[in-house]
């Protein structure tokens, strides 16, 4: 039976095995998928050994940049992102790297939540790998403006310059952000520590601005609580992004696109009972 996995460290918390088991049951695809705790000091060797038999893998923290350097060929979106979250073993044994994070977030926003980006003013918080992965698909939706804000302004400016050929994208520090915005996406890990990036209240227009945190938890994240208190029209978390990026990876491996809605519903129910 074809074998797949997710590489990470730590990895015990991963929902990917459940997601892909549900996808396989739904589509009738015969495969096994498990979580692999990869060593911090030898990810390349560990991954190569898996791919002596394995057909594909997802990659989570902290190995996305190492996976980018490991592969024999890259998709255009992975090249742009500078990170790989999906590995595919080709027929000749070479490894191809792709990045489905941006496609997953975009599909969660547009298909699941009905959020339009075209002609809108969009603020992305953070300039790390999570944000790098979504810039290309976001700019493909032709927003009026896409602003990247980061604690270190230079990093945001440099990142914006890398993607300037794709649309109206700029970078700045948190203190320089002037609102309001139609959509704000938190790509920082601040919510994990219960923090929120230091933003002016003007970034949110009550009743209009949609706020999305790439993090998720049983209770609303710190960022989404902050947004709701300031009148955001809607607050969304990253659980849908997790499911949608997995669906995109499943499609790359198997050529079958699973229905994500029932899987997302299952995960929501499970999260509520934790």
UniProtKB/Swiss-Prot annotation:
**Catalysed reaction per UniProt?**
shikimate + NADP(+) = 3-dehydroshikimate + NADPH + H(+)
Recorded hits in Pfam families, A to Z, give:
SDH_C, Shikimate_DH, Shikimate_dh_N
**GO function terms (MF aspect):** NADP binding; shikimate 3-dehydrogenase (NADP+) activity
What does UniProt list as catalytic?
Answer: 64
Q: Which UniProt keywords apply?
A: Amino-acid biosynthesis, Aromatic amino acid biosynthesis, NADP, Oxidoreductase
Positions annotated to bind shikimate: 14-16, 60, 85, 101, 216
Keyword Signal belongs to the record = no
Assembly with partners or alone: Homodimer.
Name this protein carries in UniProt: Shikimate dehydrogenase (NADP(+))
Query: What is the species listed in this Swiss-Prot or TrEMBL entry?
Result: Pseudomonas aeruginosa (strain ATCC 15692 / DSM 22644 / CIP 104116 / JCM 14847 / LMG 12228 / 1C / PRS 101 / PAO1)
